[in-house]
Amino acid sequence: MASSSVPPTAVPAATAAPGAGFGFASKTKKKHFVQQKVKVFRAADPLVGVFLWGVAHSINELSQVPPPVMLLPDDFKASSKIKVNNHLFHRENLPSHFKFKEYCPQVFRNLRDRFGIDDQDYLVSLTRSPPTESEGSDGRFLISYDRTLVIKEVSSEDIADMHSNLSNYHQYIVKCHGNTLLPQFLGMYRVSVDSEDSYMLVMRNMFSHRLPVHRKYDLKGSLVSREASDKEKVKELPTLKDMDFLNKNQKVYIGEEEKKVFLEKLKRDVEFLVQLKIMDYSLLLGIHDIIRGSEPEEDGPVREEESEGDGDCGLTGPPAPVGSYGTSPEGIGGYIHSHRPLGPGEFESFIDVYAIRSAEGAPQKEVYFMGLIDILTQYDAKKKAAHAAKTVKHGAGAEISTVHPEQYAKRFLDFITNIFA
């Protein structure tokens, strides 16, 4: 038996006519789908199963009402919840007791729209096939089957930080028209299974969904303890750091105009982070080698369209909703197949939004993926204590990672400006 508790600002359409009690305009954006029933997913991992079931439930609920004309302060505090008990009919697919909560559903709906992501494509990318586990330094890290979205398990403290900064983040995205190197936050959820809470943050994948990354760096502009460990370096795709970048004489070869646009965007984003007293962020740099990428790989990963069955998770998603033009959403990266075929190193900039191709005449034919990550750390008492401890250990002049937000930003920008050839 399912029971849901939803605040007045998010009354489900089952209990109110679309738009009733809301300040919504009668005219809405054209949607290419018809409403589907929530499908039940089957997953070996109960957490993943409940998460995907909850996302489908949430998107279906949101599709019942038009988006608000403007977001109100209450939208940044709102949440929608559903609690399911004695779910015996689907006990082989889902736990018999679970809870699912979406934070600020209207805000993230608006953010998805501003980032050019349709809700039904978002749903398909997340749920048509099971997400796969990926290596993440902190907590669990999943990637959607079409590789356009990442699902990061975060702490309750991260959720609290996101909550406190969400209004500022949304305002900034509106101001810059979504043209940013910041992470594109698309959804924030809590999943409760066996009385344990897990918190999930969904973001756009900064790397390409079709061009594999052959090298990657996490750059902070600090040189102390900023070299990948021997254990990290033996991985198939290690996360290298600042000292590795310098020791390898690595450079980023992009055109002057692309460099100018990138640095202007970076400076604007970093100024925003300084205003919020945020630090410890990194530039994530992924490098796709076009020559290597065009060579067939003997033991490369099997692409979704080539594989049979539903994979180890056994996850079954909903059929794609039928569109008003007789089409079905194909996920965030799906529409690329209806356009011209892409050659080696080519990409669609509206999907691979963090990608820049190397300049003509560059010594290496490469595609670079560059974006800011780990932007939730604010300068607080813990950081102040860590800074004091590192100053004692390394000396006041050392290039240590924990400094004041303004110092961090200056050092970070100085370093990133010099990664270009």
Swiss-Prot record:
Keywords: Acetylation, ATP-binding, Cytoplasm, Endoplasmic reticulum, Kinase, Lipid metabolism, Nucleotide-binding, Phosphoprotein, Transferase
Chain segments carrying region Disordered: 294-328
Broad EC category: transferase
Reactions accelerated catalytically: a 1,2-diacyl-sn-glycero-3-phospho-(1D-myo-inositol-5-phosphate) + ATP = a 1,2-diacyl-sn-glycero-3-phospho-(1D-myo-inositol-4,5-bisphosphate) + ADP + H(+); 1,2-dihexadecanoyl-sn-glycero-3-phospho-(1D-myo-inositol-5-phosphate) + ATP = 1,2-dihexadecanoyl-sn-glycero-3-phospho-(1D-myo-inositol-4,5-bisphosphate) + ADP + H(+); 1,2-dihexadecanoyl-sn-glycero-3-phospho-(1D-myo-inositol-5-phosphate) + GTP = 1,2-dihexadecanoyl-sn-glycero-3-phospho-(1D-myo-inositol-4,5-bisphosphate) + GDP + H(+)
A molecular-function term among this protein's GO annotations: ATP binding
Region (Required for interaction with PIP5K1A): 69-75
Main subcellular localisation: endoplasmic reticulum
E.C. designation(s): 2.7.1.149
Pfam family, one: PIP5K
Modified residues (Phosphoserine): S26, S349
Regions of compositional bias (Basic and acidic residues) in chain numbering: 294-304
Self-association and partners: Interacts with PIP5K1A; the interaction inhibits PIP5K1A kinase activity.
Protein name, as recorded: Phosphatidylinositol 5-phosphate 4-kinase type-2 gamma
